[in-house]
């Protein structure tokens, strides 16, 4: 016999063993399919310990293999914005035109026959948004007439910031005064009262300065030398009087000078409304800048 010869009885035994192991693996595979079958709820319920994921998988009809999550691909981080320098920030800020100021410009553009003030045309924000289209001598290329629409919200903003030069620079005075020329009602009364208050602040400041100047002149006269025997005694009296005046001056509340541009804006608006019955206030030592 050759070494590779297998007896018949051994071949029969091996064949039976192979068939048996094949049946077992087949049964095991079927068992796994049954376990993975999402409709086989009885199998899961028999355990009594279902997790939330398993319950969700059963409801959605998913198998275990389909619930495996793929690896998340991390998104590249967004680049940090580069910080602008102070000059760059100011340059960017100067090119921004507020909606309320655009509202004023459109009002002047449609309601006035006059040219825009040179100061308006030279603003960076106006150049950036309008270019050369605000020059009255140049006809519109498109031939389209701009229609201005009234906005109560924007008007309230203009009234609120009438005395704020940061929000409404003095270069907008002509546009602002034209807009408020026909203002009526309670808003007009409140604005008149505030403008008069600004003029009164100026007069109070001027009076305070005049009082202090007179006091300084009196001090200078008191400190002048006196002839003869009364010189020494006069110096003592003068120094005493000077000390008293200084104490009184220190005790007086310092009157701050109001912003002259706001005083001028208030004065011009009151002059527009001077035909009303409201009492006019005369400014002391005030010269209007042209």
From Swiss-Prot:
InterPro entries named among the record's database cross-references: WKF (IPR019327)
Basic residues: bias regions: 66-83
Residue segments, region Disordered: 17-91, 220-259
A biological process term (GO) from this entry: ribosomal large subunit biogenesis
One term of GO molecular function: RNA binding
Sequence ranges of Polar residues compositional bias: 40-50
Gene Ontology CC, one term: nucleus
Composition skew (Basic and acidic residues), residue ranges: 233-249
Additional information: Present with 1850 molecules/cell in log phase SD medium.
The name this protein goes by in its record: Uncharacterized protein YCR016W
């Amino acid at each position: 016999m050759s070494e590779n010869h297998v007896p018949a009885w051994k071949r029969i035994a091996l064949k039976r063993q192979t068939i048996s192991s094949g049946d077992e693996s087949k049964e095991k595979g079927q068992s796994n399919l049954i376990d993975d079958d999402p409709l086989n709820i009885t199998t899961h319920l028999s355990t009594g310990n279902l997790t939330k994921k398993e319950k969700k998988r059963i409801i959605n009809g998913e198998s275990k293999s389909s619930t495996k999550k793929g690896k998340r691909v991390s998104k590249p981080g967004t680049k940090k914005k580069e910080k602008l320098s102070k000059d760059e920030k100011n340059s960017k800020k100067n090119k921004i035109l507020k909606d309320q100021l655009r509202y004023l410009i459109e009002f002047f553009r449609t309601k006035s026959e006059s040219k825009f003030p040179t100061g308006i045309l030279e603003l960076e924000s106006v150049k950036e948004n309008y270019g050369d289209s605000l020059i009255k001598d140049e006809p519109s290329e498109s031939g389209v007439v701009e229609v201005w629409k009234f906005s109560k919200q924007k008007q309230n903003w203009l009234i609120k910031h009438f005395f704020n030069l940061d929000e409404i620079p003095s270069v907008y005075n002509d546009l602002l005064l034209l807009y408020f020329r026909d203002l009526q009602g309670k808003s007009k009364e409140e604005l008149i009262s505030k403008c008069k208050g600004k003029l009164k602040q100026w007069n109070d400041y001027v009076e305070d300065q005049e009082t202090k100047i007179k006091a300084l002149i009196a001090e200078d006269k008191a400190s002048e030398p006196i002839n003869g025997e009364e010189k020494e005694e006069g110096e003592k009296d003068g120094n005493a009087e000077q000390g008293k005046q200084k104490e009184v001056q220190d005790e007086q509340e310092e009157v701050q000078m109001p912003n002259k541009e706001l005083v001028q804006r208030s004065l011009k608006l009151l002059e527009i409304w001077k035909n009303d019955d409201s009492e006019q206030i005369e400014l002391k030592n005030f010269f209007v800048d042209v």
